[in-house]
Amino acid sequence: MDTLNDSLSLEQLVSVSPRRSQLTMAGIPPINNSGTSTGSALDSTAVSGAHTSLAGTDSSMDSTHGSGAATVSAGSPVGKDSGSGSTPSTDVTQDDDEMRKRRRQRRQRTHFTSQQLQELEASFARNRYPDMATREEIAAWTNLTEARVRVWFKNRRAKWRKRERNQLGEFKNGFGPHFNGLMQPFDDGLYSGYSPAYNNWAAKVPSPLTAKSFPWGLNSSGVPNVNPLSSQAMCFTPPTTIGTATTMVPSMNVGNGLNSLSSLQNPTVAPCPYASPGQPYAYREQCNSSIAALRLKAKQHSTSVASSFSYPSPVRQQTLSACQYAVDRPV
């Protein structure tokens, strides 16, 4: 019975297996009724199915790999463009760099108090170029750092040099623009006598003046050889007889007497071209006369006192008037 059942089952399998193989797979050789052919057909069917599944897997992997490669190849130009062109990320980094630079350039300004400024100005007036030790001392006095003191002195020296240059320019330009409105421009017409041609004044002098004979002589250009001050002294130096004349006539005008005496002694000599001075020592003569009067009174008082006692009276000198006493004394 067991053998019959096995044969029946094999026959059923053999009868069914060709149809299944024809339906499922193509290109399989016909199956014989023998058991060996049936087993080989089944084995070939399984192998072909496994191969088909593996081929499908490989194709899917290839398609996946191809799509990934396409994706990578499509994304690679974007990466190149991002490196070459400007993107928002690079703009942000540039803005950050600019902000950092601005923050570095911005420095905190030092606000000095009035006491600190007063101390710094006094130190600058004493020494414009302090050394390190002096700057440290000033920093200790003013409660500042040495760097702040050094920067302050540097700026103060620059300000001082600028002010000096401006003042020098104002002096060169004629007391600056605010003084130019007060000063009138030089006009040759108004000051023709003081023009550069004043050296040729002998050519402008009329002929009668040049024709006169002067005791001190003239050079080729007609200019006196003697200094005007010395010539003035020569004109007004009195001769030896003037002293006796003035003592005899004290009330006579000295200037007129000098001119008259010089004209009498030298009638051929031309008169002095300079005007005769008046009486420049009138105030001194008044002082001398008052002093002489006081001395005279003192002498009279001393003689009166001496005469009241029994002392021998000294020889009385000849009393002179105040005017004669003042004239006799050299001025």
Curated annotation (Swiss-Prot):
Residues 101-110 have a biased composition (Basic residues). GO terms for molecular function: DNA-binding transcription factor activity, RNA polymerase II-specific; RNA polymerase II cis-regulatory region sequence-specific DNA binding. A motif (OAR) lies at residues 289-302. Its main location: nucleus. InterPro entries: HD, Homeobox_CS, Homeobox_Pitx/unc30, Homeodomain-like_sf, OAR_dom. Disulfide bonds: none annotated. The keyword Nucleus applies. Keywords: Developmental protein, DNA-binding, Homeobox, Nucleus. A motif (Nuclear localization signal) lies at residues 295-299. GO terms for biological process: anatomical structure morphogenesis. Coiled coil: none annotated. It comes from the Eukaryota. Residues 25-44, 53-116 are annotated as: Disordered. Residues 105-164 bind DNA. GO terms for cellular component: nucleus. Residues 31-44, 53-66, 83-92 have a biased composition (Polar residues). It is found in: Nucleus. Belongs to the paired homeobox family. Bicoid subfamily. Involved in left-right asymmetry in the developing embryo. This is Pituitary homeobox x. It comes from Branchiostoma belcheri.
